[in-house]
């Protein structure tokens, strides 16, 4: 039985595809049971986030997993297969270690993914689809992720626009839990920013977008409210932080709109983060006394500094992961040898029992104990050495040379002629 990882993520698939193969939480149990009812899949766990859908499973026939994924989501395999990756055992182990450690995330080193992996494991345990291999794999996965985060600086520096946006907001407002945040737009950048801000538990989150359906998707994920784009000016005074990133060719937030908002707020400060190119917020807004306006260029300076510090941490993390992959593979190989070890010990025990019974009978008849013990030891040697000796005698040519080396290694023998 081999371990595999199959899936797609933000590196390989656009959002339109990722949405179609995502697993809704209420359907996850059914999916796990359905997958493991495939005759070839023995164990399984499913990780499904906004950025990735991955199956971790034990099988001898991994090709059936892709068929199952497409079938479960009522998609032609040809539609999803160009975006899929399938990792065999060593690569699968390394992949899940990297995912949980944040090395494969859209935001390098982000901590949320570890919690998402733990949730995926918990759901698989509750569904009864975890077995010995996956239990051990994820036990090691969590240990590796903890080691990476505790011994490297992988999560210590800001390396994304989203993280930088939160960082700059926290410079102005000491407690984000007391602030109200408005997101204008509902694309991937806004979704990523929302993930960071939601982690700081603001008092209120709202999403304004031209397309209400898309805004609903983002709002549902983060417990936010949906707002029409045409009421942003009216509602602006009620928000302390505004993050905007749309594809609009013209500014959405103008100077007059912000001036009225500041007046209504009685000059309480407001942080505005404009991630759009071209800008969503008129540049003149930044000249207002109570407005802290940051653009893409401002955030890029923070990100660049973080990236430089992060490179060494990535190298250190990869070294840890490679070492732990080898350790896990060693455990798997040792586990594969367990049945043979048991059979070998059982064979030796059978020989011992037979010879001991014979010796006991001889002693009961009054035979010389020394002779009985001598016969016992010779009997054990002859029977235990019979199979290896016959194997050597029956081997020929290169096979005999290999057999000789194997026996010498097994019994720690020297190769001297005498």
UniProtKB/Swiss-Prot annotation:
GO biological process, one term: protoporphyrinogen IX biosynthetic process from glutamate
Residues the record lists as binding NADP(+): 185-190
UniProt EC number: 1.2.1.70
Top enzyme category: oxidoreductase
Gene3D superfamilies: Glutamyl-tRNA reductase, N-terminal domain, NAD(P)-binding Rossmann-like Domain
Site, Important for activity: residue positions: 95
Pfam families per UniProt: GlutR_dimer, GlutR_N, Shikimate_DH
Pathway given in the UniProt record: Porphyrin-containing compound metabolism; protoporphyrin-IX biosynthesis; 5-aminolevulinate from L-glutamyl-tRNA(Glu): step 1/2
GO MF annotation list: glutamyl-tRNA reductase activity; NADP binding
Catalytic activity: (S)-4-amino-5-oxopentanoate + tRNA(Glu) + NADP(+) = L-glutamyl-tRNA(Glu) + NADPH + H(+)
InterPro entries membership: 4pyrrol_synth_GluRdtase (IPR000343), 4pyrrol_synth_GluRdtase_dimer (IPR015896), 4pyrrol_synth_GluRdtase_N (IPR015895), GluRdtase_CS (IPR018214), GluRdtase_dimer_dom_sf (IPR036453), GluRdtase_N_sf (IPR036343), NAD(P)-bd_dom_sf (IPR036291), Shikm_DH/Glu-tRNA_Rdtase (IPR006151)
Binding positions for substrate per the UniProt entry: 49-52, 105, 110-112, 116
Active-site feature positions: 50
Keyword field: NADP, Oxidoreductase, Porphyrin biosynthesis
PANTHER family membership: GLUTAMYL-TRNA REDUCTASE
Domain notes: Possesses an unusual extended V-shaped dimeric structure with each monomer consisting of three distinct domains arranged along a curved 'spinal' alpha-helix. The N-terminal catalytic domain specifically recognizes the glutamate moiety of the substrate. The second domain is the NADPH-binding domain, and the third C-terminal domain is responsible for dimerization.
Subunit structure: Homodimer.
Other observations noted: During catalysis, the active site Cys acts as a nucleophile attacking the alpha-carbonyl group of tRNA-bound glutamate with the formation of a thioester intermediate between enzyme and glutamate, and the concomitant release of tRNA(Glu). The thioester intermediate is finally reduced by direct hydride transfer from NADPH, to form the product GSA.
Family: Belongs to the glutamyl-tRNA reductase family.
Function summary: Catalyzes the NADPH-dependent reduction of glutamyl-tRNA(Glu) to glutamate 1-semialdehyde (GSA).
Name of the protein in question: Glutamyl-tRNA reductase
